[in-house]
């Protein structure tokens, strides 16, 4: 895909995802937790879109290796965040 076309598609998709998040927040009667879940979903999709369209993650001869590095970093981040939350909740509930 041409670079200009790729950047244009990525830009338009990012704007659409942002507007969808604004619409969900302002114009729906969903619960707070449902809104946050949907917005986080849009955020993760937009982050992946940014990596693929603008950061050229999969391009070049090391594209596949870069993809594995990003996936590994995401897994480490999730383990750290979820593990920290789990430990904090366990410590908080044992003190009550």
From Swiss-Prot:
Q: Provide an example Pfam family for this protein.
A: COX4_pro
Q: Which UniProt keywords apply?
A: Cell membrane, Membrane, Oxidoreductase, Transmembrane, Transmembrane helix
| Cited InterPro entries | Cyt_c_oxidase_su4_prok, Cytochrome_c_oxidase_bac_sub4, QoxD
One Gene Ontology BP term is:
ATP synthesis coupled electron transport
E.C. no: 1.10.3.-
Q: Which residues cross the membrane?
A: 8-28, 36-56, 68-88
EC primary class: oxidoreductase
Entry keyword Membrane = yes
Q: Where in the cell is it found?
A: Cell membrane
GO MF annotation: an example:
cytochrome bo3 ubiquinol oxidase activity
Q: Which reaction does it catalyse?
A: 2 a quinol + O2 = 2 a quinone + 2 H2O
Superkingdom of source: Bacteria
Q: Which GO terms describe its cellular component?
A: cytochrome o ubiquinol oxidase complex; plasma membrane
Membrane topology for this entry? Multi-pass membrane protein
Its chief place of residence is membrane
Coiled-coil ranges per the record? none
Q: Which family does it belong to?
A: Belongs to the cytochrome c oxidase bacterial subunit 4 family.
Protein task: Catalyzes quinol oxidation with the concomitant reduction of oxygen to water.
Q: What is this protein called?
A: Probable quinol oxidase subunit 4
Q: Which species is this UniProt entry from?
A: Staphylococcus epidermidis (strain ATCC 35984 / DSM 28319 / BCRC 17069 / CCUG 31568 / BM 3577 / RP62A)
The encoding gene is qoxD
